[in-house]
Structures are given as C-alpha cells and as structure tokens.
C-alpha cells in the first residue's frame, strides 16, 4: 500500500526552504502586512515538549495562509535566554551560563526546524546578545531620564536560596517562590523600581482597544485594581501626629470603631506606648517573615496588637484604638485602614476576636451574628441618616473636603515594578553611582554595557550580585578624577521580553532600536499566541514599555498586540488511585482494558494531568517526529479540539492523523488526475474551500481539518479527480501539513517552485447552491416514492413528474384521482379512491 514516507520527504523540504530562504519576510509595499508572533521560549535544558508546537503550529498555519493570500508576512522566532535556570545550572556545574544557553538554543532550533515552521531565521533575536541588550539598556536609560526608573528602600520578597529579591507577581499563594518553591521573606533593600503606576489609568483604559480574551483583560483589570473613594485623615490623640486612610466607603465613617496600621507603617514606633512596646516589636518581627500573599489570606486566623494609642474619628470626635495587624500592607493604599466591623467581614472577625465595638450604620442584618455587607439606608450616621449608598458617599466626601479632613481619591492596587535582581545572568543596569552622591546613566555611545565574563557567579553574600566581586569592571573614574561604582544589580528576565517584538521588525539596526518607517509598517502585532500564564506579568510589562516608547515617539501605536490568543494545555496520560493521588506511568500496568498499580494491585482510574517529569508522562516531539512525522504531529495537535481547550494527549489520535495523511497521499499519487470536470465534486470542493478559508481565519483549525476529511472521503468515491480540484485541495492542506503539501504540489505540477506563494484557491458561490432537491410522493399520506428533481419547479411541473413516475403509476392504476396537492421543494400528495 502506498504511504507517505515522512523520513525522506520532510528533511528534503526543510533543506529546500532553508537553501531558498523561502520564508524571508516580504517587503513589497503594495501588499497588506500580517505580523504573526509566538511568545518566544526560554531555551531550557529539557528542550521542546509537545505543548510548545501547539501555539507555534497555529501561527504557522496563519502565516502560510496569509502568504498565499498575498500578504507580506512577518513570522519570527527568538530566545528569551537570560534568567535564573541557566545561572543555577552554571553554579551547580561550574559551566558558563552563556555556553549552556547556546547549547540549549541550538537544540531548540533543531527541534523547531524539524517541525517545518516557516520562520524567517534572518530575524532571530537572543536577549543575551549584547547587540540586542544594548537596546534593552537604552530603554532603561530613557525610563531613568523620564523619572520612571528610580531607586528606593523597599521591603522586598527575598529568597535566600536564590540569593535575590523577586517581584510580587513571582510569589506563589503559599508564600514560596514561583521558581524553585523556596521560602520568601520580607526584608528592606535598596532596589531599582519602574514607575508602572504612572501608566495605571492608560493600561486600564486601552484594554478596550484590543481584541483579547475577556478573561485576560479581567485579570489585568483586577491586577491594576482601580478603586474610587476618599482619603480620610485621623489625628492621634495627645500627639501632633496623624495618618491617612483610603476607603471606598467614606459613607460608613460613623461606624469606624478602630484603626489598623501595617506593622511597617512609619508611625507605629512613634505612637506605641511604653506598655505595648515589647508586644509591638515582637509582632513586627513575626510579620516580617511572612509574604504579602500569606498575610492577606482571607482564611487565616486574624492576629494583631494594640499600640496603646487612640485616634480621633474626624466625623464624630470619638476615640478609637489604633492596632497593628499583618493583613494591612504598607505597600497597599496608605498602609492604614479604618475598620467598620459591622459591614466588613475581615474587620468583623478581628473585632470579635479582640472584643472591639461593632456599630451598624446601614439598615439590615444582625451585626452581632455576622457583618452585613449588602447595601441599605444609613442609620446611626447623623447627617447621612436615611440616604442610600451613592448619595451618602457624595455627601460625606463633600463634608470631608469642607472640613479639611479628607478628599475624593482614586487609587490602584498596582504597585511599582521591582526591577533589580541580585544575580549575574542578566542585563547590567547602565547606571554609575559617583562618590559625590550623584548617579548618572551610561551614555548611549558607551552602550552596550557588556556583562563581564567570570567563573565566579555565586551570589556575593552581601545582598549584592556577583558583579560586586569584579573590581576591574565595577570601579570607574571620570575625567575629572571623581571615582564611581557601577550598578551591580541586573535586570529581571522580563526586561528583554518586554520589547522583543519590536526588534524582530529591524533586528540588525545598529543605530536605533528599529527604523521608524518599518515600525509604522508592521505595528501592531496582528496575532500574538501564547499561554494564559503570562496574563499579568509579561503582557502588562510589555504594554507599559510600549506606552513609554509611544510617549517618546519611538513607536506609532498605543498598544503592541492587537489580537491575543491563548492556546490550551496539552495534558499527559496519568492515573489516580482511590485516594485521588496521581501515579507515575511506570508504576501502571494494563490488564483486560483496565489499569492497575504494579506494586499494590489497586485498580486505577485514567485521568489526564499536566505533563511532568515526576509522572513520567512527558511526550518528546523528537520521538513523535521520528515515528509519525512532523506533519502528523501538526495535524494531530490542531485536530485534537478547539485551540483554546486543554485536551489529553492520545496515541490513538496521533495514529488517526497519520492514517488521514496517508489517505491524502494515496488520493493524489494513485487516483487518475483528469483535465475534465465531471461536476461530481463541484459542491463539496467549493464548500471545502469556503469552510477552510473562513475557519483558518477564525483559528478554528479542528473544524477546518474535519472539512478536509469530508473532501477526501468524497473524492475517494470518484474514479477520477479533476486536476484543478486536486491542486486546490493540496493548497488547502499545505499550511497544516507543509511537507506533504510541497511534495504533492510537485506530483501535480512539477513546477520546482514552493507552494508557499501560490495564490490561495477561491470558491464559486453558485456551486454551493443545491440545484437539485429530493421530494417525497405520498399516496393517502404514505410515502410511495422519492424523486430527485430540479429545484424550484412549479406545482404543475411537480404534479406531472410525480404522476409520470413508474412506482406511482403502479400504485394508482385503476383508481380515481380525487386531487393532487403539490408543495414546491417538499412533496406531492395524491388523494385516490
């Protein structure tokens, strides 16, 4: 039987594409543009897994489709190659992280090329290349000049095992680090911060302008966390001190019965009484060991200590105790809250635990039993009594402003971005600190500030990065003799990935980040495909940098990525025992269609789970390509289900996709191809062109493949295949299975040219219309015959055809026809006697 020899055909076409630079980005200004972007990978030691190609295949199909439709297509690939794993590996093995990274990139590139992706490798970028990070550093100097990069003494998330501080976004809910799962403690350090908060409103508003999944937009909205309310100032009794709280419910001020400061609040030591000093100091120490996430966990037991001080509630003059508690964060809002326990669950639990007053100020509920958190008319609130929420907020804000004790205020949950890392393997921050106390940016003419090569990359132990040990690099002297010290912190991995999509547009420019005209031509990115796990971090940071560059006049668009698509996860085969615990695949045996634990004999349930080394269910694409071919892997991953769904890997599904490609190969190579069109496939062919064109455009790749299968089934029933339809079909399948597409194109045309730029097939709308229709003929209400007739025949024509039918004539022979009812396009009913 004829089959598709992938081991011969796939390498042949990969070599052809490379030799002929088939996928070099088009520059014909008269053509429309299409910029298809993948989230570039971190080149880990493990190489690609089968989850990577899912998104890559989707953008590749779109890119091939758009080339055939006459677009200039920019479809690049590169490497997000700085970051902790390479450094950790280097420290463990004594190898240079640059060498390790280069080896990993070579392996990734080999694997990617084996899958037949149509990348323009002339545009490859690598974030660790000094020619690339020169511009990462240049962007930093612009942020610094604009006052958007600054140093501050801030409590950071310190990870002792990693020897570095990490951003809030990199701390897991259990208070450990995202990388490595190490304990995170809070400690104050001098750090570089980026003022992303200055862009909070624009980052929020401009989400309306992009075509992104609503779930991702909501995650960004929640992270930015805009709230409108009021600042209220409380004086501390018997002192000249005061503190400000932000509240979204100033209308409940009459119900504020105590105040809480964050343990780190600057006022705590100044207002704590001698009696309470020891308890407060101990509580502050314990709070410093917890992460922000652990401190704000709603489920945890409420803890706190009274400072001994009282504040004055400005609206009624009542004295209220001032506490410290770790659920209030110094970094959020003002680091102080007014507590209204009658109407807030956390405040209510705290008040009950420490026996504090609970005064209801909204009608409804029983505040002795639980906090009443719904809306109601105001009570116990003097001039607000009887008002609803909106009216009461407006009136209270007016009163606060008139009395000079508060004002209307908009706040954001978003914090400034902690930008420095105490590690070696990252972009050096281009700042010099001089002995006279000033700091300056390294001038553009001296960029890139190259990361020095060193064997000693262990953390310095002082909280500084290993660069602090390299005195030759570290110490500088100005022309006027003033001595200086380079910044020893490096940038986080997020830096290089915040702008890489711009460098692809003009990757070899030595004079500027990218040429203005080229940026105008290619921006924004038309489709960006990657995992939903980057919803907040990378996507928010990239949007922030893009807006800064827009303000500088570097980029012409407000937003970088017009459309975002998150592919689902490919899950591995795994098994669960009766306790719900996952069992590694090497501990499972199959007997009579069921699965059992090899050691305990317990019957197991098959349950898809994330692929992991521990479960031994990771599928390596190299193995799949070797056994089934790259085209099979591509078609299978697109046919598994909707692209955004998470679906379990299946060997049977893979075999099904392989069989389909073999059938396609046989259809084109063994069926008689003719120049005469019998018309038998007119409808299904034109339906297939229409469906595949529309569904690829909408990224519904699974339904497009299903339609290709429909065509193959129909074509196999015919003795001959019309040449134009054979060619058109091969063009339709080529973006999904490009090696097979190229091979079959040569079988049909012997052109010697790639199929990549052959104009995409069009369909004939008139051939989609049914010209014939089946109608039923009933006699006395029972179906006696079915006729295939021309569409839209008149009643008379239908009647004549029905009465002329042999079966009908046999049924009515010797009977009187009372009447004939003909319904066009449906039926003929004959009443006889």
Curated annotation (Swiss-Prot):
Pfam families: Anticodon_1 (PF08264), tRNA-synt_1 (PF00133), tRNA-synt_1_2 (PF13603), tRNA-synt_1g (PF09334). Its EC number is 6.1.1.4. Keywords: Aminoacyl-tRNA synthetase, ATP-binding, Cytoplasm, Ligase, Nucleotide-binding, Protein biosynthesis. ATP binds at residue 613. A motif ('KMSKS' region) lies at residues 610-614. GO terms for molecular function: aminoacyl-tRNA deacylase activity; ATP binding; leucine-tRNA ligase activity. It is found in: Cytoplasm. One of its GO terms (cellular component) is cytosol. The keyword Nucleotide-binding applies. This is Leucine--tRNA ligase. It catalyses: tRNA(Leu) + L-leucine + ATP = L-leucyl-tRNA(Leu) + AMP + diphosphate. The keyword Ligase applies. It comes from the Bacteria. One of its GO terms (biological process) is leucyl-tRNA aminoacylation. It is an enzyme of class 6 (ligase). Belongs to the class-I aminoacyl-tRNA synthetase family. HAMAP family: Leu_tRNA_synth_B. A motif ('HIGH' region) lies at residues 41-52. It comes from Streptococcus agalactiae serotype V (strain ATCC BAA-611 / 2603 V/R).
């Amino acid at each position: 039987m004829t089959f598709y020899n992938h081991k011969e055909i796939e390498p042949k076409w990969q070599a052809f594409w490379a030799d002929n630079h088939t996928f070099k980005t088009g520059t014909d200004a008269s053509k429309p543009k299409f910029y298809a972007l993948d989230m570039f990978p971190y080149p880990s030691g493990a190489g690609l897994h089968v989850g990577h190609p899912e998104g890559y295949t989707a953008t590749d199909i779109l890119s091939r489709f758009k080339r055939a439709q006459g677009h200039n297509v920019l479809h690049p690939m590169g490497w997000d190659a700085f970051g902790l794993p390479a450094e950790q590996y280097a420290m463990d093995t004594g190898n240079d992280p640059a060498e390790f990274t280069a080896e990993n990139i070579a392996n990734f590139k080999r694997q990617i090329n084996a899958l037949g992706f149509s990348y323009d490798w002339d545009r490859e970028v690598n974030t660790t290349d000094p020619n690339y990070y020169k511009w990462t550093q240049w962007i930093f100097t612009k942020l610094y000049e604009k006052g958007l990069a600054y140093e501050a003494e801030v409590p950071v998330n310190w990870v002792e095992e990693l020897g570095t501080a990490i951003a809030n976004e990199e701390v897991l809910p259990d208070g450990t680090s995202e990388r490595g799962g190490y304990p995170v403690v809070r400690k104050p350090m001098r750090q570089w911060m980026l003022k992303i908060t200055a862009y909070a409103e624009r980052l929020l508003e401009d989400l309306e302008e992009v075509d992104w999944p609503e779930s991702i937009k909501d995650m960004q909205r929640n992270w930015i966390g805009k709230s409108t309310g009021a600042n209220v100032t409380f004086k501390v009794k018997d002192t000249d001190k005061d503190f400000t709280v932000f509240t979204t419910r100033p209308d409940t001020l009459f119900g504020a019965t105590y105040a809480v400061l964050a343990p780190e609040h600057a006022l705590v030591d100044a207002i704590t009484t001698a009696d309470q000093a020891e308890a407060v100091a101990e509580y502050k120490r314990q709070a410093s060991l917890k992460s922000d996430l652990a401190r704000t966990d709603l489920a945890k037991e409420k803890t706190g200590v009274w400072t001994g001080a009282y504040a004055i509630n400005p609206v009624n003059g009542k004295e209220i105790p001032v506490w410290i508690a770790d659920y209030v964060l110094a970094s959020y809002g003002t680091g102080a809250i007014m507590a209204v326990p009658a109407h807030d669950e956390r405040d209510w639990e705290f008040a009950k635990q420490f026996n504090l007053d609970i005064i209801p100020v909204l009608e409804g509920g029983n505040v002795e039993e639980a906090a009443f958190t719904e809306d109601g008319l105001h009570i116990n609130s003097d001039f607000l009594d009887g008002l609803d929420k909106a009216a009461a907020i407006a009136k209270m804000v007016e009163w606060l402003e008139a009395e000079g004790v508060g004002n209307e205020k908009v706040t954001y949950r978003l914090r400034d971005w902690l930008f420095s890392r105490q590690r070696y393997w990252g972009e050096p921050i281009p700042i010099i600190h001089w002995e006279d106390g000033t700091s300056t940016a390294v001038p553009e003419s001296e960029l890139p500030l190259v990361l020095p090569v060193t064997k000693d990359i262990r953390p310095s132990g002082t909280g500084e990065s290993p660069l602090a040990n390299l005195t030759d690099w570290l110490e500088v002297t100005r022309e006027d003799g003033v001595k200086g010290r380079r910044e020893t912190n490096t940038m986080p991995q997020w830096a290089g990935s915040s702008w890489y999509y711009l460098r692809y547009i003009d990757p070899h420019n030595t004079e500027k980040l990218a040429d203005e005209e080229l940026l105008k031509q290619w921006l924004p990115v038309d489709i960006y495909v990657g995992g939903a796990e980057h919803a907040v971090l990378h996507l928010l940071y990239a949007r922030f940098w893009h807006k800064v560059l827009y303000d500088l006049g570097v980029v012409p668009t407000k937003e970088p990525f017009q459309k975002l698509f998150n592919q689902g996860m490919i899950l591995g085969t795994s098994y669960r025992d009766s306790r719900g615990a996952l069992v590694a695949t090497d501990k499972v045996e199959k007997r009579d269609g069921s699965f059992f634990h090899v050691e305990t004999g317990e019957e197991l349930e098959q349950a898809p789970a994330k692929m992991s080394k521990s479960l031994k269910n990771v599928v390596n694409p190299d193995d799949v390509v070797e056994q089934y071919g790259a085209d099979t892997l591509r078609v299978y991953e697109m046919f598994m289900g909707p692209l955004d769904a998470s679906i379990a890997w299946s060997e049977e599904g893979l075999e099904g996709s392989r069989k389909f490609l073999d059938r396609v190969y046989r259809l084109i190579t063994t069926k008689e191809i003719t120049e005469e069109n019998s018309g038998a496939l007119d409808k299904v062919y034109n339906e297939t062109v229409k469906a595949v064109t529309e569904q690829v455009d909408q990224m519904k790749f699974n339904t497009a493949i299903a339609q290709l299968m429909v065509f193959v089934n129909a074509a196999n029933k015919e003795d001959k295949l019309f040449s134009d339809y054979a060619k058109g079909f091969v063009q339709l399948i080529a973006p999904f299975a490009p090696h097979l597409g190229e091979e079959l194109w040569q079988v049909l045309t012997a052109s010697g040219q790639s199929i990549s730029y052959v104009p995409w097939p069009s369909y004939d709308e008139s051939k989609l219309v049914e010209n014939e229709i089946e109608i039923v003929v009933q006699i006395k209400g029972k179906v006696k015959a079915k006729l295939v007739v021309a569409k839209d025949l008149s009643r008379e024509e239908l009647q004549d055809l029905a009465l002329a039918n042999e079966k009908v004539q046999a049924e009515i022979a010797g009977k009187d026809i009372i009447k004939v009812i003909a319904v066009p396009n449906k039926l003929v009913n004959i009443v006889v006697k």
